[in-house]
């Protein structure tokens, strides 16, 4: 076995690289961790850890009955103030505030079934206060050498900024619609060379109906009517 301890740091091939978190793993005191010493980790766990440490995408693995927690640099940003204390800790203690929300998903993964969740809203506490956050992620079972499920792997992308941006755009559009609807005179928004009506208030539609009716009654040639409101 080539696994040795150099200058207080583990020299284990599967722990190579990994940026700041990789360096922390190599220097970590694993006594008391539910994961035990890395030299005793099974090959299945070593493979997952080697993968996540050398990925730029946020990832973590929870292992064993106590769900010992390991992650990479990208996921450390999601943890916020929970990092670095979360390294090697218990999954349930790290994310205690959302445990009731995610435990059914974890249980499903530990039963051998993967799952995918898009823009899941959670109330997290990672900056010394509670905040809304949204995540798109997958939970996948990880099997030990004997084929039993020994842990779960997660690849996750925080979508909070995207969700909030979509909310702002939706809110701004609704304010514009309200402005149109409440305008004391007729108002419309047209687009393109055909003057397609993008938005119009009741006053405008009433005026347009009257104007069109007047043209038809006069039997004069009429310009091509504007396309319907979309």
Please annotate each region the language model reported.
Residues 3-27, 43-57, 169-195, 202, ...:
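PAS/LOV and related PAS-like sensory modules
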Residues 27-35, 77, 81, 85-100, ...:
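PAS-family sensory/regulatory domains
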Residues 60-63, 70, 95, 139, ...:
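Aromatic/pi-system hotspot detector in well-structured domains
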Residues 47-51, 97, 105-109, 206-207, ...:
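Amphipathic alpha-helical regulatory segments at dimerization interfaces
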Residues 143-146, 150-177:
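Sensory coupling linkers of modular signal transduction proteins
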Residues 65-77, 81, 194, 198-209:
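PAS/LOV sensory domain surfaces, especially short acidic/polar patches at coil-to-helix junctions
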Residues 49, 60, 68, 76-77, ...:
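Sensory helix hotspots in PAS and closely related PAS-like folds
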Residues 6, 39, 43, 97-101, ...:
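Per-ARNT-Sim (PAS) sensory domains and their PAS-associated C-terminal
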């Amino acid at each position: 076995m080539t696994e040795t301890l150099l200058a207080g740091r583990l020299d284990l091939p599967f722990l190579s690289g990994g940026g700041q978190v990789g360096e922390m793993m190599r220097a970590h005191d694993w006594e008391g961790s539910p994961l035990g010493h890395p030299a005793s980790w099974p090959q299945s766990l070593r493979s997952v850890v080697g993968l996540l440490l050398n990925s730029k995408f946020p990832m973590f693995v929870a292992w064993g009955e106590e769900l010992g927690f390991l992650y990479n640099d990208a996921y450390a940003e999601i943890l916020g103030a929970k990092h670095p204390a979360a390294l090697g800790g218990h999954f349930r203690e790290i994310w205690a505030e959302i445990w009731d929300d995610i435990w059914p998903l974890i249980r499903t993964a530990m039963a051998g079934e993967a799952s995918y969740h898009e823009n899941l809203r959670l109330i997290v506490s990672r900056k010394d206060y509670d905040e809304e956050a949204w995540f798109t992620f997958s939970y996948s079972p990880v099997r030990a050498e004997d084929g039993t499920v020994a842990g779960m792997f997660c690849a996750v992308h925080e979508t909070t900024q995207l969700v909030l941006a979509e909310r702002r755009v939706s809110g701004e559009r609704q304010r514009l619609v309200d402005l149109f609807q409440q305008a004391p005179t007729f108002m419309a928004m047209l687009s393109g060379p055909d003057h397609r009506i993008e938005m119009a208030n009741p006053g405008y539609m009433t005026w347009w109906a009257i104007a069109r009716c007047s043209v038809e009654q006069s039997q004069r040639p009429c310009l091509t009517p504007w396309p319907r409101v979309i």
